[in-house]
Design a protein with these regions (language model features):
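Alpha-helical segment proximal to the catalytic Tyr-Lys
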Residues: 129-130, 171-175, 233
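Conserved glycine-rich Rossmann-like NAD(P)H-binding loop of the short-chain dehydrogenase/reductase
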Residues: 30-47
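Conserved glycine-rich cofactor-binding loop
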Residues: 9, 16-17
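Active-site loop-to-helix junction immediately N-terminal to the catalytic Tyr of the SDR YXXXK motif
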Residues: 104, 144, 148-156, 168
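C-terminal helical subdomain
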Residues: 182, 203-235, 242-244
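Substrate-binding pocket helix/loop in short-chain dehydrogenase/reductase
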Residues: 100-101, 105-113, 193, 201, ...
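Active-site helix of classical SDR
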Residues: 124, 158, 166
């Protein structure tokens, strides 16, 4: 373990699996005390915490639906009560939808925006008042916002909203020395990414990157950890595309 984040408390939304799990584990390995958030995956969240504890880190699992103000409030309240004042917020919770725009239902549209945009809005709104001065926020977007891929219109719309909200929020939080940045992964080898894809699809997307492979959750986690750290203290209001040279 390193001491990069020693004494810091981090909330990572949607961290029971995939990229979120990797971010939580990475921060814990660098001495942060981590809130592993899940909505319905209790067993998976507990497994992530158990693995962190086995490796000598500090973490607890917190059930909270960040699509609601009550859920976001619960997340911060439990973190503060159990681990102390919060220094870092990582908004990783998200959903994806592959459908031509004309086929997307109103319910699907609302559901996707509730997770990807409203969840980020609600936690950032709380962070504006409750994150410790000098803290750091990283919101997850996607490199697909620049690819204009058919069937991605609704998903990309949610991530574009997150990016623009983050850029402006960074300016608003400057007075408290709180940095706000975005990380936009490219195709990353996770359960969410692989859902509904054939091996041919996976290989085709891997070859789109200059480095000719899919990213791993650990690739993204290391970028997020760096952005949160004091080493990135002059990086603010930026969108870091971690995609192996995809775009």
């Amino acid at each position: 373990m390193s001491n990069t984040h020693e004494g810091k408390v981090a909330i990572v939304t949607g961290s029971a699996r995939g990229i979120g799990e990797a971010i939580a584990s990475e921060l814990a390995s660098e001495s942060a005390k981590v809130v592993v958030n899940y909505n319905s995956g209790k067993a998976a969240g507990n497994d992530v915490v158990a693995a962190i504890l086995r490796d000598g880190g500090k973490a607890l699992a917190v059930q909270a639906d960040v699509r609601t103000a009550a859920g976001a409030e619960r997340l911060f309240a439990v973190a503060e009560a159990e681990l102390g004042p919060v220094n870092y917020l990582v908004n990783n919770a998200g959903a994806i939808l592959y459908k031509p725009l004309a086929d997307v239902t109103e319910e699907e549209f609302d559901s996707l925006f509730a997770v990807n945009v409203k969840g980020t809005f609600l936690t950032c709104k709380l962070a504006a008042r409750r994150l410790q001065e000098g803290g750091s926020i990283v919101n997850l977007s996607s490199s697909t916002t620049a690819l204009m891929l058919p069937t991605y219109a609704t998903y990309v719309a949610t991530k574009g909203a997150v990016e623009q909200m983050s850029h402006i929020f960074a300016k608003e939080m400057g007075a408290r020395s709180i940095r706000v940045n975005v990380v936009s992964p490219g195709p990353t080898d996770t359960e969410l990414f692989n859902e509904g894809k054939s091996e041919e699809d996976r290989q085709r997307m891997a070859k789109m990157a200059a480095l000719s492979r899919l990213g791993t959750p650990a690739d993204i986690a290391r970028v997020v950890s760096w952005l949160l750290s004091s080493d990135a203290g002059w990086v603010n209001g930026q969108n870091v595309r971690a995609n192996g040279g995809l775009i």
